Amino acid sequence: MSEVEHQELDLNGEMLARREKLAKLREQGNPFPNTFRRDAYAEKLHAQYDEVEGEALKEQDIQVKVAGRIMLKRVMGKASFFTIQDVSGQIQLYVARDNLAEGVYADKVSMWDLGDIVGAAGTLFKTKTGELTVRCSEVELLTKSLRPLPNKVQGLTDQETRYRQRYLDLISNEESRRTFMIRSKMVSGIRQFFLEKDFIEVETPMLQVIPGGAAAKPFITHHNALDVDMYLRIAPELYLKRLVVGGFERVFELNRNFRNEGVSVRHNPEFTMIEYYQAYADYHDLMDNTEELLRKLAIDILGTTTVPYGEYVFDFGKPFERITMHDAIVKYGNGITREDLDSFEKSVEIAKGLGIEIQKSWGLGSVVNAIFEEVAEHQLIQPTFLMAHPAEISPLARRNDENPEVTDRFELFIGGREIGNGFSELNDAEDQAERFDAQVAAKDAGDDEAMFKDEDFVVALEHGLPPTAGEGLGIDRLAMIFANAPSIRDVILFPAMRQK
């Protein structure tokens, strides 16, 4: 018999034994009671009483009601120790036959297994080893677990199982619970940051007739009642800018986007972003905003502006570097000159030498961008704003007044990865229409990620968009940094997985 077959046999036997216990418990009443009114959490109890001496604790006679999942169990005849886990941490229970009502220990507590959820009321005390413990006078089974937990020594270590059965991961791994608590705190902090700056939070369509706001492949669906193909949004940008046209001068949306592309340690087809727009501001203002936001998040979440991530330590306390795309290539490109990047023929030659496959629809701007991604992107380790992107690859960004071939745009890179993208918005309706036409031509030439033309958005611009800047920040990638997580799947509760 194989190891897998042995494990399946053991599992089946364990589940059968638990179901038999459940049947006996049903004879005594409902083993799934509706409520238990607890008044204490493990973390707060430890914070308040871990340093209190045993005698002093006994004199205080502190009564508590706790609840949680059984993670450890030690049976010693007429008494047992259980370690239960709630959302905040773990606390030990001392359950003795003589401290409970008659028959409770033999008929009920004896049926408890690892993974069961229980409630207990009693008095705090310290064991001989000094561990804070609840001496239970009342106990109640709240939920019977029919499946055993992962091995209590090894925990849940299989990565794929952790992603597919996130509930087991959260039960078994404190680090995973910490990761998602960090993410939650980060999201709350971001929302509060913008609300305090007088932004209003809005919601824009997830289903769109024309997907826009980014260069990406959309998911396609069909609306039966309207008999029209629709797309899951790739970005909320064009709708948010319509709102600025309408007079909402500071707006943000913190929500999901969808892109029908590859899955990797940095990419999930369903992901979270905050996108915000500020009238009467430019891209320099947004870079300042971003520095302020990340510095505040680091302090609020980690208590410091130095953020460890893998082999790196990011410094959010000092001003972020600001460098143009062309200067970054010259800096890291091993002899590539600015003059090289001004020549289409020379840039193509350099790109081919780097193994880059040139697309038919590419102009000079796309070639230069591909060279940057190959030679410089991975070098931007400390927080860096990359600026002055070619207009060709920035169809929604405002052209730079001094050099119309590039735009007033920035991307935020941390650890060699893009975290955010922002720019002074293009508010010239005629220029926008021309750039949409160029995107349509690129799509016709085979570029699946080129943008659709949104005529209604052009009409909105014709009514007048004030000088505006906007930015999108990837929530998942930011969470990776603050939680020191190597994969985007580690910070998404239920990441996309191939079906078994």
Curated annotation (Swiss-Prot):
Binding site for Mg(2+) 1: E411, E418
Entry's Gene Ontology BP terms: lysyl-tRNA aminoacylation
Disulfide bond residue pairs: none
Entry binding sites for Mg(2+) 2: E418
InterPro entries: Aa-tRNA-synt_II, aa-tRNA-synth_II, aa-tRNA-synth_II/BPL/LPL, Lys-tRNA-ligase_II, Lys-tRNA-ligase_II_bac/euk, Lys-tRNA-ligase_II_N, Lys-tRNA-synth_II_C, NA-bd_OB-fold
Cofactor remark: Binds 3 Mg(2+) ions per subunit.
CC cofactor: Mg(2+)
A Pfam family it matches: tRNA-synt_2
Catalyzed chemical reaction(s): tRNA(Lys) + L-lysine + ATP = L-lysyl-tRNA(Lys) + AMP + diphosphate
Localisation: Cytoplasm
Cross-referenced CDD domains: LysRS_core, LysRS_N
Record has Nucleotide-binding as a keyword: yes
Gene Ontology molecular function: any one: ATP binding
GO cellular component: cytosol
Keyword annotations from UniProtKB, A to Z: Aminoacyl-tRNA synthetase, ATP-binding, Cytoplasm, Ligase, Magnesium, Metal-binding, Nucleotide-binding, Protein biosynthesis
EC number(s) from the headed UniProt entry: 6.1.1.6
Family indicated by similarity: Belongs to the class-II aminoacyl-tRNA synthetase family.
Assembly information from the UniProt record: Homodimer.
Name the UniProt record assigns to this protein: Lysine--tRNA ligase
